Amino acid sequence: MDGPHLAIAASDAPKIGVMAGPGTGKTKYGLMRRVARLLSEGVRGNRILLISFTRVAAADLRDKVAELDVPGAEDVRATTLHAYCLSLLMRDSVLALTGRHPRILMNHERDLMLRDVGGDFGSIHDRRRRVEALLAGWARRTADHPGVAVDDDDRVFEREVLRWLLFHRAMLIGEVVPIAHRYLSTNPAAEELEALDHLVVDEYQDLNALEQDLLEVLSTHASTLCVAGDDDQSIYSVRYANPSGIRAFVSRDDVEPHGIVVCGRSPANIIEMANSLIEHAVDRDKPALVPLEADRQGDVSIVQWTDVPSEIDGIVSAIADDVGRREVEPGDILVLTNWRRIGERIRARLDDLDIPVRSYFTEEELASDDGREAVALLRLVVKANDLPAMRVLLGLGEASGRSGAYRRLLSHCLDSSLDPLDALRRMAAGERLAGLKVPALLERYERAENRVQHLRTLDLPNLVDELLPPDSDDLANLRGIALDSLEAAEAAVDVLDDIVSAVTQDDVPQNPNFVRVMSLHKSKGLTANSVYVVGSVAGILPTITSTHQAEAEAAAEEGRRLFYVALTRAVHSLVISASAAMDLADANARGVKYDKSTIRRSGDRFTVRTITSPYIAELGPSAPRGERGNSWLASRAST
């Protein structure tokens, strides 16, 4: 590709802004050509930094850099912004100087913290939203001043969260950006500000306002800052991503703008459907995507099943037919759903059929108490004073994590300058601590300590067998990771590191030999010949949890962008699947709205009527007419 791609590569402008739609080749043919040109002109690789938000996008950048046949390419760093900030803070001892510890909380550990802080901060959902605002530097809107909490409740919340984290010698991964921003903004002599000549940023629309400002700070002394993105693909409002940031950057007077609209990935009819969909976005004023091959048509189906079990059966049958009779490689199949449960059931069914498959849902290995307990025990085997791990064990088996009792323990410890582990240890030895009674916590502490002491006597293979027994379905994935780790592990800490890395990073490969099942969010940056979008019903796509009109409207807008991303993953075939009914319990758990008059009894369960996602009606004349699932399966069998 030439034209805008070549112009991006050749530009010597100090600031370059690229607005590029999905599948337009901006990364491979624009940004990578730019890096290759800089290297060929003598720029040292370690003076070039490539940044993206997601690990998938960063891994894609690393792969493409590795393909450059230019001296110095091996020294170019391609990473996520969070990974870069963490390494910067560790290297410059900023964390140590500020008394912070790089013990990163997992999601379930973070939720325990949010329950423990107390206060009138609403439900756990409200608290998650508030902590994301904290991690975004309180930049909930682009007009907010990054890094500053203005609201009194926000200030109190921030103080309580930081006190918990300091007391537990832990931090949230999202903290590294605000800390790095504060450090670099207030230390103009920092070496990092002189370390870069060229900064290239991909997927800029996924960053929040604080992160976007941090990149401006990082590029203070750089020769060039090249930013690429697409506001139509901004899908991270949960962490206050700023889609208007890319529009504002490209329109600045000091920025050389470029646009790419020709899509070489998807067939013309799928591109037309995607264009029709995104044209319904509020206040959108952009040119439509243009197919590279106007006469290339994809195989598109929109199907509806009688209920969710029928949908799972049908999709599994279709994939089995793809892999078997049609000889489609499993790695060419991508299954996307906003409903984790249906995705996990599809994965399990494919696995039963011996079809290679992996799912990629956030920390899914730790969805059960058994998984959380196993990892917490392993952490304590490795490090006896891992307080967040003990906090997990103290709260297991109770919906609130025994947060009331734990708050009493924390309050006593703060007043007495005691470590919670020391307090529990002293009470277990028979000492009475004035005014403190937490029998449930003490019982679980003693049980945990006994198990940890026993586990420390075992060699690595037996340690894995006891923590992750082979007969547990809930622990099967964790056990698989641990067994793989045993091949090279020399100590328990090696197994723990491999488990934590696999569970929290969970990098999705671009070219695997297995079917990939994941959320629509996780699909960003991926491409597949065959894409199945499953569970496409109102209430799931979009998922709207807020009762506030403005927030609900924003969620609906982002849901459309999310569906747009999903459609444009497809290279050859696309199946959009929905059901006409789901279990009442599932509808309530997911917050799906339904008419009570549609509740029906089906055996020992109740179902409610569902309708297809409202976005399906926005796909335009290029979309095929919907059909019943069974009829669709029958028609596939005859072709």
What kind of region is each of these model predictions?
Residues A423-K522, L526-S530, I540-I544, P624, ...:
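Accessory C-terminal helicase-associated subdomains
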Residues G17-G30, R34, D254-E256, V262-P356, ...:
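Helicase P-loop NTPase motor core
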Residues M1-L97, E272-N275, T568:
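P-loop NTPase Walker
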Residues R252, R296-G298, E327-R456, N462-E466:
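ATPase/helicase motor core of nucleic-acid motors
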Residues A78-S87, L199-E203, A228, W339, ...:
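Conserved helicase core region in the C-terminal RecA-like lobe
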Residues L410, L414, V537-T639:
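C-terminal accessory regions
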Residues M1-G30, R47-L49, R115-E203, A209-V217, ...:
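Accessory N-terminal region flanking or inserted into the helicase ATPase core
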Residues P22-T24, Q205-E279, P287-E293, G539-P542, ...:
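Conserved helicase motor core of SF1/SF2 NTP-dependent helicases
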